[in-house]
């Protein structure tokens, strides 16, 4: 019997309204929500769909933040919009740029809370890693975010806002009247920042509806990857309601080790998780599932682990991303040696699976995989203390 996923309803997202009595922030509203809001503000129902489409394109295609600039709308209608609505994004507190070009943004959201967003430029593409929660409930022992307690879920607007802020910083909004440029600086999006996306399903789903909309931010679902530690009851919903690529934060080949590295395994173990994945490619029209596997020296990197991994995922269209562990202050683990990682990858490759080794990016600014944590929450524990807590 499958358990219901705990969607942390005890940690409610803040409403999209500005201070009491203020206008409604439309960033993150779905098309249906925006149209209903326009009607409630006095837009005639027969015009609502057209007006919604016009506002949508101004906000998400052109990046406009001022209703007065929406020049294909009548002046009195622009005034009505300004009276009832606002276009408000989170605030960039700091921006750090790594020696390799990676950018890390510390972003302040409603309530003064902070999350981190990372932009990774690569040859021919640019990947944006966004956060879905302030902190995390999962306490994965190798992950820096897991040492920060969950504060709250992000709203759909706060998730979409991360994309818009980075496009601001990169100057990626099109210029009206200029020739069309198909180059995309933000071409890929990964939900791999702070938090477990499937513990904030509704807001993540609604945010992705905005991000994937062809008349706005227009990122293809094939270029969006959601990474989950294994919230089994929400995996089928992800396929049906979002349909993006799926990555599994796997990291171990036995329940004994995964219970420690990824404690959610105690609720949904390896077999239960893998059984839930077999239909995902068909339901979502995805080619394959990505298994993420962090390489920890002496913990999960043996030849036996590699052979078990291949056996476990047999029958699931997949690839395995091997991630050299990115250390953070107080981390209880060390990165596997390059030779050990290469030997592990070779076993997987010879079994017929792609096994790329991820090149760490942004390590010098603590922006690499597993290193994100709100700057105001960087409480440092000693390596011995965390090792004692995890039992390794």
Swiss-Prot record:
<dbReference type="InterPro" id="IPR040072">
    <property type="entry name" value="Methyltransferase_A"/>
</dbReference>
<dbReference type="Pfam" id="PF21016">
    <property type="entry name" value="RlmN_N"/>
</dbReference>
<keyword id="KW-0963">Cytoplasm</keyword>
<feature type="binding site">
    <location>
        <begin position="195"/>
        <end position="196"/>
    </location>
    <ligand>
        <name>S-adenosyl-L-methionine</name>
    </ligand>
</feature>
<comment type="function">
    <text>Specifically methylates position 2 of adenine 2503 in 23S rRNA and position 2 of adenine 37 in tRNAs. m2A2503 modification seems to play a crucial role in the proofreading step occurring at the peptidyl transferase center and thus would serve to optimize ribosomal fidelity.</text>
</comment>
<feature type="active site" description="Proton acceptor">
    <location>
        <position position="116"/>
    </location>
</feature>
<feature type="domain" description="Radical SAM core">
    <location>
        <begin position="122"/>
        <end position="364"/>
    </location>
</feature>
<keyword id="KW-0819">tRNA processing</keyword>
<keyword id="KW-0949">S-adenosyl-L-methionine</keyword>
<feature type="binding site">
    <location>
        <position position="227"/>
    </location>
    <ligand>
        <name>S-adenosyl-L-methionine</name>
    </ligand>
</feature>
<dbReference type="GO" id="GO:0002935">
    <property type="term" value="F:tRNA (adenine(37)-C2)-methyltransferase activity"/>
</dbReference>
<feature type="binding site">
    <location>
        <position position="136"/>
    </location>
    <ligand>
        <name>[4Fe-4S] cluster</name>
    </ligand>
</feature>
<dbReference type="InterPro" id="IPR048641">
    <property type="entry name" value="RlmN_N"/>
</dbReference>
<dbReference type="InterPro" id="IPR004383">
    <property type="entry name" value="rRNA_lsu_MTrfase_RlmN/Cfr"/>
</dbReference>
<feature type="binding site">
    <location>
        <begin position="249"/>
        <end position="251"/>
    </location>
    <ligand>
        <name>S-adenosyl-L-methionine</name>
    </ligand>
</feature>
<keyword id="KW-0479">Metal-binding</keyword>
<dbReference type="InterPro" id="IPR013785">
    <property type="entry name" value="Aldolase_TIM"/>
</dbReference>
<dbReference type="InterPro" id="IPR027492">
    <property type="entry name" value="RNA_MTrfase_RlmN"/>
</dbReference>
<dbReference type="GO" id="GO:0005737">
    <property type="term" value="C:cytoplasm"/>
</dbReference>
<feature type="binding site">
    <location>
        <position position="140"/>
    </location>
    <ligand>
        <name>[4Fe-4S] cluster</name>
    </ligand>
</feature>
<dbReference type="GO" id="GO:0070040">
    <property type="term" value="F:rRNA (adenine(2503)-C2-)-methyltransferase activity"/>
</dbReference>
<dbReference type="GO" id="GO:0000049">
    <property type="term" value="F:tRNA binding"/>
</dbReference>
<keyword id="KW-0004">4Fe-4S</keyword>
<dbReference type="GO" id="GO:0030488">
    <property type="term" value="P:tRNA methylation"/>
</dbReference>
<keyword id="KW-1015">Disulfide bond</keyword>
<dbReference type="GO" id="GO:0019843">
    <property type="term" value="F:rRNA binding"/>
</dbReference>
<dbReference type="GO" id="GO:0051539">
    <property type="term" value="F:4 iron, 4 sulfur cluster binding"/>
</dbReference>
<keyword id="KW-0808">Transferase</keyword>
<dbReference type="InterPro" id="IPR007197">
    <property type="entry name" value="rSAM"/>
</dbReference>
<dbReference type="GO" id="GO:0070475">
    <property type="term" value="P:rRNA base methylation"/>
</dbReference>
<keyword id="KW-0411">Iron-sulfur</keyword>
<protein>
    <recommendedName>
        <fullName>Dual-specificity RNA methyltransferase RlmN</fullName>
        <ecNumber>2.1.1.192</ecNumber>
    </recommendedName>
</protein>
<comment type="similarity">
    <text>Belongs to the radical SAM superfamily. RlmN family.</text>
</comment>
<keyword id="KW-0408">Iron</keyword>
<feature type="active site" description="S-methylcysteine intermediate">
    <location>
        <position position="369"/>
    </location>
</feature>
<keyword id="KW-0489">Methyltransferase</keyword>
<dbReference type="GO" id="GO:0046872">
    <property type="term" value="F:metal ion binding"/>
</dbReference>
<feature type="binding site">
    <location>
        <position position="143"/>
    </location>
    <ligand>
        <name>[4Fe-4S] cluster</name>
    </ligand>
</feature>
<keyword id="KW-0698">rRNA processing</keyword>
<dbReference type="Pfam" id="PF04055">
    <property type="entry name" value="Radical_SAM"/>
</dbReference>
<feature type="binding site">
    <location>
        <position position="326"/>
    </location>
    <ligand>
        <name>S-adenosyl-L-methionine</name>
    </ligand>
</feature>
<feature type="disulfide bond" description="(transient)">
    <location>
        <begin position="129"/>
        <end position="369"/>
    </location>
</feature>
